[in-house]
Regions:
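Bacterial N-terminal signal peptides that target proteins for export
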Residues: 1-7
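Bacterial N-terminal signal peptides
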Residues: 9-17
Length: 461
């Protein structure tokens, strides 16, 4: 149903004049984070984008095991570097997969914990230019993203097993043997590599890993690296560097409840696997469409990792996931891009987003047929499904909005309704806040993604 025919369904609405007599209790919209160095416009654009794609790929893929974490002997692990010469790496093809998925930004793992650098760096000889491949992957992918209008971001591990001269990857902080050259060296080394990624490759996002290193958060390392970022690219946004320097919080494989400030969830098409092996098991696209739906209703972004194979190609199964997600977003993207979560808190059945006076209701496949939303202080003017021509069944009374979406209307993916109200939607409807933690399922089974409660206001800095 197009906008011109919206008015045709308004006659189906029933409303009570007294429904708006007393405004509902709402929580006011919260400000953006108060870090004085944050570029607010850049962070707003990030929040508008809602979906990003990540790529883990490097010589370690030849081991057919997880990157870094499979390292039990550094010499054996690093011996594969001399054989790395993939035949089918094409940065344009990678960018095309991100574009097909509906992503607006790309984050590439330029250096994982193993310390191997996928760019032409002056900081170490442990880099891609000293392999038979001898191509600057970061440069090629940055250029491909620019051509496709994708924001380019760079993942950089603070932990560097090669530079730290450790013999293996340590999963527990208590097992780590310390740093031969001390934390100041790690901070300087990380800052120098950060400067290269910002100035040579126009990185717009610095996405760190390894801030859990023993002593890192207690050192001046985060502040030292932040100073480089703010000087070299003040518009770049930062996450996972540690302490109070981050512009937003990113959580791994956890769906947060609603949070007023920007946040991100990162997971993989083959979670818990992030780099390619021949035993990978993929989740279906419907799983990630539902994940994206839950995340955006909680006012967050989803960063979805894809895993190119040893030859540099993205396997067909992953391309199918990207195409299916992109197809859903093509039909429902106006409920995702540029919107904000709320004004209803996410629940087991789904949640809502809004933009101006437009309320988008995300109804998950396993939701009950009928939902009741408490009064939001606005009168319903018109409504439609984003993907069906049938007029929705929605009524408005003193009790709020009653939304009925029969299962024969729904498919295997989230169904979205657009409800146009008589004024802009602001704040959160307190009556919709779940009284107990939300227990979620995905595709009818308990999700391996855990609910995590987040503060609803910006953290004190």
């Amino acid at each position: 149903m197009n906008r011109k025919t919206m008015a045709a369904v308004t006659a189906m609405l029933t409303s009570s004049a007294s429904a708006l007599a007393a405004p509902p209790a709402t929580t006011p919209d919260q400000p953006m984070p108060v870090n004085p160095h944050t570029d607010r416009a850049a962070l707003q654009r990030f929040a508008d984008d809602r979906l990003g794609v990540m790529f883990h790929w490097g010589p370690a893929v030849l081991r057919n095991q997880e990157i870094s974490w499979s390292m039990s002997d550094r010499a054996k692990y690093e011996s594969v570097y001399k054989d790395f010469n993939p035949k089918h790496f094409d940065a344009n093809a990678w960018a095309a997969v991100a574009k097909a998925a509906g992503a607006k930004y790309v984050v590439y793992v330029c250096k994982h914990h193993d310390g191997f650098c996928m760019w032409d760096t002056r900081t170490t000889t442990n880099n891609i230019m000293n392999t038979p491949f001898h191509r600057d992957v970061v440069a090629e992918l940055s250029a491909a993203c620019a051509r496709d209008g994708l924001m380019f971001g760079t993942y950089l591990s603070i932990m560097d097993i090669h530079e730290d001269k450790w013999n293996r990857c340590y999963a527990a902080r208590t097992q780590m043997p310390g740093y031969p050259q001390g934390l100041p060296h790690i901070a300087t080394f990380t800052a120098d590599q950060t400067a290269e990624l910002l100035t040579k490759y126009n990185s717009q996002m610095m996405w760190y890993d390894g801030a859990w290193l023993q002593g890192w958060r207690q050192s001046d390392g985060p502040a030292k690296v932040e100073a480089v970022i703010r000087a070299d690219n003040p518009k770049a946004i930062i996450t996972r560097l540690g302490n109070d320097v981050d512009d937003y919080e990113c959580m791994e494989a956890r769906i947060g409840t609603y949070r007023a400030v920007p946040w991100e969830m990162v997971t993989s098409v083959a979670y818990p696997t992030y780099s390619f092996n021949t035993h990978i098991k993929y989740k279906p696209a419907s799983f990630f469409i539902e994940t994206l739906s839950r995340v955006v209703c909680g006012n967050g972004n989803l960063l979805l990792n894809f895993v190119p194979d040893a030859d540099g190609a993205i396997p067909p199964e992953q391309q199918t996931i990207a195409a299916d997600m992109g197809g859903w977003l093509k039909a429902n993207g106006e409920a995702v891009y540029g919107t904000r979560g709320g004004p209803y808190y996410p629940n087991t059945w789904g949640g809502t987003t809004h933009e101006g006076n437009r309320l988008f209701v995300f109804v998950l496949p396993d939701a009950p047929d009928t939902l009741t939303l408490p009064p939001c202080g606005r009168k319903l003017v018109s409504l439609r499904y984003l993907t069906h021509i049938e007029p929705p069944n929605v009524t408005q009374t003193d009790a709020g909005l009653t939304v009925t979406v029969p299962k024969d209307i729904r498919g295997s993916d989230t169904t979205v309704l657009e409800l146009t109200m008589d004024g802009d939607l602001t704040g959160m409807v307190e009556a919709s806040r779940p009284k107990t933690p939300v227990k979620i399922k995905q595709n009818g089974v308990p999700a391996p993604i855990e609910e995590r409660t987040l503060p609803t206001t910006a953290p004190a800095r």
